């Protein structure tokens, strides 16, 4: 059982059960989903991520309360993290197609040289406690 203790009053804010099999299943499902993700064009991925950002931000009040309870940040300051998250996400999504496009390099000895960025696997982000949403972008 994982417990989150709120620094506000040192009580248990939430508890999450886990087991090894569920963790393994989650990783396995992530690997399967990543193959589908990699098959999408960058433009399609960008559209999906824009919807994700909108969906996340539609829960702003809930997230602000969670940030406050989990890390003790005053509720009046917690919304700034989500504003920063949106600014970063919007910027990264605005440059994604250009930055992830194929880079053609000069040919050498009848070889076509290029750099192609492709999604190659699943990653796990363990965000720092002080800016859990902002640093996820």
Residue ranges of model-derived segments:
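N-terminal Rossmann-like NAD(P)+-binding subdomain of aldehyde/semialdehyde dehydrogenases
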Residues: 1-111
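Conserved small-residue-rich beta-alpha loop and adjacent elements
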Residues: 104-137
